[in-house]
Amino acid sequence: MFNSNCRNKIFCILIFFSLAFFTENAVCEQPKKRDYWPTGDWKASAPEQQGMDSAKLLIADEFIQNRLPDAFSLLVVRNGYLVFEKYYSWGSPEKIAVVHSVTKSVTSALIGIALDKGYLDSVDQKLIDFFPEYASGDLDPRIKEINLKHILTMSAGFRWNDRGPVMRDWYTSEDWAKFTIQLPLVTMPGDKFNYNSSISHLLSIILAKSTKTSTLDFAKQNLFEPLGIQSGFWRQDPQGYQIGGFGLGFSARDLAKFGFLYLNNGYWNGQSIVPEQWVKQSTEQQIQAVRHPFYGTFGYGYQWWVKQVDGCSSFRAWGRRGQYIVVVPELDLVIAVTSNPGLPHPPTSIHYSPLFDLVAASVKRKRPPKSPLTAVELPADVKAFILDYDQARFNKDVVKMAELISDQFIYNGVTKQMAVEFLSRNLPYMSEAKIIITKYEQEGNEVKIDVWLKDKYFEAPFMTGSKLIKENDHWKWFGNQVPNSP
């Protein structure tokens, strides 16, 4: 096992090897039978004994130190054994981390357990049936059509922004459930994904009402204690309900246990903890979620994110400020990450994705050769524009970047102002990566391009399918004019 003293281990002197990233055709494996269960604690194993490459794991370690300064821990479990465990900054095995929205995935598991035990009937049950006190005559009739599945898939349709003033108003209100249910509806239930922590909280209230116990007590009896999870805390709302969308405290090892439960389809030491069918439904895409210019499309299940990792199907619990459980069933792999929960939201948050590809790439398996990125030839004026833009990006020159981006810019819902703010942050992975144009099509004053970023750790599409447009004889970045999911 790697730990904080791993540099004293013999296998730590192995030489770094190059990695292949974003390989869609990588050969994946199936989970194996377990010869022990980590109810008490994890058993350690050298990476090579579990079919992993120590040197490549060390590249993941280097990536954290060079790219993710807020990280507290990285744990890697392969074949049920802890093959890598390292703590950074203030992290430690005993530290209970605020895991933010990883809480949502735990709440989802509890909903599945409650359904299995008969406390709930089905995901088709209407939200308002659990809150009849708010079913007044002037309530939008569409709200009465919202069911549990809409809540689980973030498609209830309420007007909401998790980082906007509505979140603050909800958080400071006296009755969180009432505030949420009386929000205006902007889309029909089930039509569109919109990330919303307030509706995840409703799931916790529904659990407490249905089971006639607190969400925490229900979790301890039916989930935490069978797995040997020692939860540190679970914050409450003003009415005393555990917060369904955030506020849970877990150690990194306990995060890995929860991921291991889902890796094993809800079974633990021969006992079904979370129904297998619920695990399957929760971790497969129920709705398209986020389209990100750097990492492509994320799907969403029942409070779980769905995204490939190094070419293999995968799902993840994702908490703000760098809290993750990533499960890759085809590689028999669980990755747990905790980070400083108290810092301002780091611009590196979504940049944890290459870390998971790095870890998965350390699993020894047959892999087809990776085709190198090939840059296309560009006309002199377009090439000059790209070079100017690249230099402004590297220098974080906000004024210059604003000059080079059209006022009409929109890329998957990202406006010019948002793009400039994002690009001007202290993002080493953005400023140090090389831009490679792999596709170029010009028609009049418009140019369609595919752009990739490449550095020593990764290569990834960036603003792919974007356009340049000539305005007053000057090329400017135009985006793609396609609205995105929130």
Q: Where are the language model's segments positioned?
A:
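Active-site SXXK
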Residues: G80, A97-V123, I151, L203-L207, ...
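Active-site Gly/Thr loop motif
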Residues: Q230-S231, K280-V334
